[in-house]
């Protein structure tokens, strides 16, 4: 006689980027093993790929392509799946800002962690009095490939390619140019023709993108100093 199947509950959440409602299940022991092995490797690419594989297995709504979701959707989705799988209290070690060395364990309720959307953020960039550009959010795949970092000069070329891939269209009052209909060379040359002020507006798009964020207070047991700490991005919640 075959062993019985264990029923797995399903839950729902709303994707921050689109407002779309999706169903998901907790990850199973076999999927948790994949995550543990990846985390132990301390390799960012392996960890990211493990998260992506687990999300593909856990998302139950048809038509959701995990690899194309914006990074903040990925982070929010994974955090919720993790909460339903192993507990909704997350233990994080925080380094006290006043001495930058003392670590304090803090328990965070996962329900309190949300994706923050900046009022300054817009995917519409004005280039001049007649020309506008519409951006699209980078996917997890694009971040893996580019190792995106504006401040790392060694990565500027890869960052440039990421920016080019995130331009959805360029338009004026009379005409629209979809980058899907352009060559990479054409898009790159268009970017290179910008002045510094125009390019900074593109940087602002990435810097103000929605992100996981949570504010906490920590007290240094050695000094008694209380500090405000801001956790941003998925990595901060697994410190």
Predicted regions, residues:
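Long C-terminal interaction/binding lobes of large macromolecular proteins
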Residues: 1-239
């Amino acid at each position: 006689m075959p062993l019985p199947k264990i029923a797995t509950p399903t839950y729902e959440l709303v994707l921050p980027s689109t407002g779309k409602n999706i169903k998901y299940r907790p990850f199973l022991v076999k999927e948790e093993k994949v995550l543990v092995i990846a985390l132990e490797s301390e390799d960012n690419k392996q960890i990211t790929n493990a998260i992506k594989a687990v999300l593909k297995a856990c998302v139950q709504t048809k038509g959701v392509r995990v690899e194309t979701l914006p990074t903040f959707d990925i982070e929010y989705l994974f955090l919720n799946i993790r909460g339903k799988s192993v507990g909704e209290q997350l233990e994080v070690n925080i380094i006290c800002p006043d001495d930058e060395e003392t670590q304090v364990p803090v328990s965070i309720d996962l329900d309190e962690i949300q994706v923050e959307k900046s009022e300054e953020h817009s995917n519409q960039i004005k280039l001049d009095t007649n020309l506008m550009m519409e951006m699209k959010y980078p996917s997890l795949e694009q971040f893996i490939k580019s190792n995106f970092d504006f401040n790392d000069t060694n990565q500027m070329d890869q960052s440039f390619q990421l920016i080019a891939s995130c331009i959805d269209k360029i338009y004026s009052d009379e005409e629209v140019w979809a980058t899907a209909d352009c060559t990479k060379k054409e898009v790159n040359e268009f970017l290179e023709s910008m002045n510094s002020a125009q390019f900074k507006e593109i940087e602002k798009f990435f810097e103000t993108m929605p992100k996981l964020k949570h504010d906490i207070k920590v007290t240094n047991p050695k000094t008694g100093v209380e500090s405000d700490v801001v956790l941003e991005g998925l990595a901060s919640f697994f410190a």
